[in-house]
Amino acid sequence: SRLAELEMSEAQLVTLASIVQAEAREVTEMPSISAVYHNRLRDGWLLQADPTVLYALGGPRSRLLYAAIDSVADSPYNTYSQRGLPPGPIGAPGEAAIDAALHPTQEDFMYFVARPDGSHHFTRTLAEHNRAKADARRAWDRLAAGIDGSDGSSPDPR
């Protein structure tokens, strides 16, 4: 079965799909977001999924700061401090998110950041990711200043 190929239980798949659902703004990006998390799990990395920390904090925040992440460091849902998937779903995933969790893109993406338009910039290396984050900060700062910079070319700092 596909779950056996992925070395995941049904519960783990639903948990991963719930993270993909919470992270994605565009359904077309779900398989790429899923690939990042599958790749991180495969390589033993922390997932570092913002939606899981927001879940641990009890809900949305306008911005996720390191102090907030640290405040729930011991939570099993804090994927910045706890390895692997959290113990359960953080929401109800839709069919597209479940399909993306089952069938991630075959890319070696390890990182992504959100752009002001809600789409994501996917990268393979830390150097690429750091450049994307720097671009993101500038784009979000322009947006906060009321300067139209939401052309989709700059990602959101996460």
Stretch-by-stretch model annotation:
Residues 1-158:
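Bacterial extracytoplasmic/cell-wall-associated proteins, especially those involved in peptidoglycan
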